[in-house]
Swiss-Prot record:
GO terms for biological process: methionyl-tRNA aminoacylation. It catalyses: tRNA(Met) + L-methionine + ATP = L-methionyl-tRNA(Met) + AMP + diphosphate. Residues 563-664 form the tRNA-binding domain. Is required not only for elongation of protein synthesis but also for the initiation of all mRNA translation through initiator tRNA(fMet) aminoacylation. PROSITE patterns: TRBD (PS50886). A motif ('HIGH' region) lies at residues 15-25. The keyword Nucleotide-binding applies. Its EC number is 6.1.1.10. A motif ('KMSKS' region) lies at residues 310-314. The keyword Ligase applies. It is an enzyme of class 6 (ligase). It comes from Listeria innocua serovar 6a (strain ATCC BAA-680 / CLIP 11262). This is Methionine--tRNA ligase. InterPro entries: Anticodon_Met, Met-tRNA-synth_bsu_C, Met-tRNA_synth, Met-tRNA_synth_2, Methionyl/Leucyl_tRNA_Synth, MetRS_core, NA-bd_OB-fold, Rossmann-like_a/b/a_fold.
Amino acid sequence: MPEEKNTFYITTPIYYPSGKAHIGHAYTTVAGDAMARYKRLKGYDVFYLTGTDEHGQKIQAKAKERGISEQEYVDEIAEGFQELWKKLEISNTDFIRTTQDRHKTSVEKIFEQLLEQGDIYLGEYEGWYSVSDEEYFTETQLEEVYKDENGKVIGGKAPSGNEVELVKEESYFFRMSKYADRLVEYYNSHPEFILPESRKNEMINNFIKPGLEDLAVSRTTFDWGIKVPGNPKHVVYVWIDALSNYITALGYNTDNDTKFQKYWPADVQIVGKEIVRFHTIYWPIMLMALDLPLPKMVFGHGWILMKDGKMSKSKGNVVDPYMLIDRYGLDALRYYLLREVPFGSDGLFTPEDFVDRVNYDLANDLGNLLNRTVAMINKYFDGEIPAYQGNVTEFDQTLVDFKNNVVKEYEGSMDHMQFSVALNQLWSLISRTNKYIDETAPWALAKEEDKRTELASVMTHLAENLRIIAVLLQPFLTRTPGEIFLQLGLQEENLKKWDSIYGYGEIPEGTTVVKKGTPIFPRLDAEVEVTYIQDEMKGSAPAPAEETAEVEALETPQIGIEDFDKIDLRVAEVKQVDKVKKADKLLCFQLDLGEGKLRQVLSGIAEFYQPEELIGKKVIVVSNLKPVKLRGLMSEGMILSGEKDGKLSVIEANSALPNGAKVK
């Protein structure tokens, strides 16, 4: 049932404007937008924040290269981000820029407070600094070191692969170690603070247990930043400057802090996995020092990768979101981003997968359902939707029950930010509705005059399911739901609201559909469009490169018998199973391993099981296999099966074992 109205504050990271906004930025921001739209539909007062982090040495260097001022440079790049958000129809409430006076003033007050209460002190720092990462590293943290003939370290590379230089300077430090125990206690008492669960374990084992060192929070080697109050040769470093945006945008530390009082703490902060550490260690410790409540959740999502690894102009694999929107439409890109990759995991972008999603999911499954429904209502009832009657055909109640179950599952998935799972559940309703047409055979009913009541019932159930599907699509797609409402002739706003999905038979008798609906997603010529996208991606390279064999970036490791003890076997509960298109032997599983998110695993058992047979079973999974791509889908593990006479049977675990239990 609909929830009581409340506030909901969601943020993306503020993006560093050192280059053009790309599909990775779009992915994060579209995900946040889907959540913001979902909560608004459910009646929440939503504040959705995004923005740009505009200070630092890299910005200063980029502006110098261009021969323009730092402010001119960031103005230009920030405008590009806002243009992309407009093109993606992002419904953000605010766009914070760290060069804005509202941010600067609040940051100065935050720094002064931390200094006065002794959480910040003045000292001297020497370490290996990466300009690109804007981070210091100890010698032991370097991925690679360069030594002179005497063995002295003279340089190296950060874990990111970026070059480092030795920097020694006076710096203000934040007493991180003072809050380490308190932070771990908070993790333990708030299990959903860091999601997925694996990110929390990484923070504790890799950063907190080895011991938190005090953090340098000012710089003197560049001056493009907020000056430290009372000591202007220092600029406030990124940790306090950038991370504070989530509260400065709400008016924290100002005379008008109404928004801060209303919306803080944030309900969810979405970040890429590479900056989880900053948002789950530095940021909460800073808030503890300020005596402010911590965000309720920090969700670290994975990366969108290419077959040859990360996007790079030199590799010719950069995906331009503007190109995809202009050629295929906004909703095609928004759908692909959140359907293709389980949120929280890494995933691959391929032109083939993108075109397949448009053709199979959007054009065939959804588009054809709408086209057939509108055409039949015009043909059999002169374009008017008949009055609703329940349980007329033997298939009606089954369809309604299926809808009710999907709505429940969909809301559960959305509340846990499992966007791909929610869309998968929604598409199961689309598939079930298409199957309902085959079951009821309206073309046969139309031939018998005494079956007129049954035929009318089929039309109303199809129209009603499409209406509900359109409502459920609204968090993800910004234009398609309106087109579905338009073609069904639905003008009343109450038919488009979230509360309307809990009932059935809401469409008024006599509602007139359009005479001939335009296909909402025209089918693409797969060969032509795949080639087009590939050529556009290659066009991003500065010069032609030699042809190389196409290698998958993620390969399944070879494990010998002597390494068997390295295999991590876990109990997993099957939550969702789907057939894989164009692959007769594969099933796609969504598994709960107790990680705080579902894991996608593909298994070649489709000829031995129907998908619905497997839902709810406890299976055993090899959980530490490197992800591999099968038929365009990522598989993050392997389900164990036994074989007899050529038939595979899934090995089931005791149902009493908890999800994620280790098998020994």
